[in-house]
């Protein structure tokens, strides 16, 4: 495994985000499998929240699906790196504030969310919505 992914894995265990992700996967009834680059893929998560095809807590990628596409895994891997850079749990309020700001300025939770943009909107399957004040009449 690449050194940067080993660092990310260790950092996310130390900052407790990966243990939190593992706990969420257990509570959510997900089946855990080793993934690429030190990720842990948790399939069959049973809860409807959060509303996303997949979400990442530490190095744990949780999904209700039974498989994930390569691009989505790359996207979620970038979120795992964000957890490490945010030193773990501070990622939660930072992400929520970023999501709220995106909703306010364009009406979509991901389009202007800095975390989703840095993880690549296209790889995550998110649209690129225009800002409210830049929309022409009749566009939505």
Where do the model's predicted regions map?
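Metalloprotease/metallohydrolase-associated module, dominated by Zn2+-dependent proteases
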Residues: 1-37, 41-45, 49-52, 87-140
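Generic hydrophobic alpha-helical membrane-span motif
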Residues: 65, 80-81, 85, 122
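Short pre-active-site segment immediately N-terminal to the catalytic Zn-binding motif
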Residues: 48-73
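Active-site recognition of the HExxH zinc-binding catalytic motif
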Residues: 71-83
């Amino acid at each position: 495994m690449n050194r940067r992914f080993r660092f990310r894995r260790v950092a996310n265990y130390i900052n407790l985000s990966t243990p939190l992700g593992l706990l969420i996967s257990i509570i959510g009834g997900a089946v855990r499998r080793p993934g690429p680059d030190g990720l842990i893929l948790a399939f069959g998560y049973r809860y409807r929240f959060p509303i996303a095809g997949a979400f990442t807590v530490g190095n744990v990628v949780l999904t209700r699906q039974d498989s994930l596409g390569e691009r989505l895994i790359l996207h979620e891997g970038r979120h795992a790196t964000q957890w490490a850079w945010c030193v773990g749990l501070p990622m939660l309020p930072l992400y929520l504030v970023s999501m709220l700001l995106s909703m306010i300025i364009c009406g979509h939770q991901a389009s202007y969310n800095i975390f989703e943009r840095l993880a690549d909107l296209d790889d995550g399957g998110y649209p690129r919505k225009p800002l409210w004040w830049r929309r022409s009449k009749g566009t939505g």
